[in-house]
């Protein structure tokens, strides 16, 4: 697994990711970063409207990438496919995924105290978008 800055043993030892803000408006934010080095630039766009929240990812090279959605402990997954994840809160419609997996995870609610939760791992190459709502 790669992180967006080069890290070793919990200490940053490599160069920091360079982030460029492309758009910042009340309903849309878009930026890219080069923190994956030779793996290319990662570009992400967030769009919100009255009915949904949309996230679009693109990676400049053809590497296999993973987008993570960390769920709150009270969110339950009702069904999951490569194109749609249904929870007890909302539906997530996915376009561009090569696969989707649900993994057990933990979220910290205070120092050194955790709740069990789920994380959605969406695997893709080049482009991915998902809409929540």
Feature-to-residue mapping (PLM):
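Beta-strand-rich recognition/accessory modules
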Residues: 62, 93-133
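Catalytic and substrate-binding regions of extracellular carbohydrate-active enzymes
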Residues: 1-81
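N-terminal functional modules and adjacent low-complexity/disordered segments of proteins
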Residues: 31, 66, 87, 104, ...
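C-terminal structured "cap/appendage" subdomains that terminate the fold
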Residues: 85, 89, 93-94
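Short stretches within intrinsically disordered, low-complexity N-terminal or propeptide regions
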Residues: 19, 33, 92-93, 99
């Amino acid at each position: 697994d790669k992180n967006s800055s080069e890290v070793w043993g919990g200490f940053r030892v490599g160069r920091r990711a360079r982030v460029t803000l492309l758009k910042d408006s009340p309903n849309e934010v878009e930026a890219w970063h080069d923190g994956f080095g030779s793996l290319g630039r990662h570009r992400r766009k967030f769009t919100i409207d009255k009915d949904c929240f949309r996230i679009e990812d693109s990676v400049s090279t053809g590497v296999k990438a993973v987008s993570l959605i960390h769920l709150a402990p009270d969110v339950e997954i009702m069904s999951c496919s490569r194109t749609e994840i249904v929870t007890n809160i909302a539906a997530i419609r996915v376009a561009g995924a090569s696969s989707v997996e649900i993994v057990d995870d933990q979220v910290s609610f205070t120092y050194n105290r955790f709740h069990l939760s789920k994380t959605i791992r969406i695997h893709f190459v080049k482009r991915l978008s998902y809409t929540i709502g």
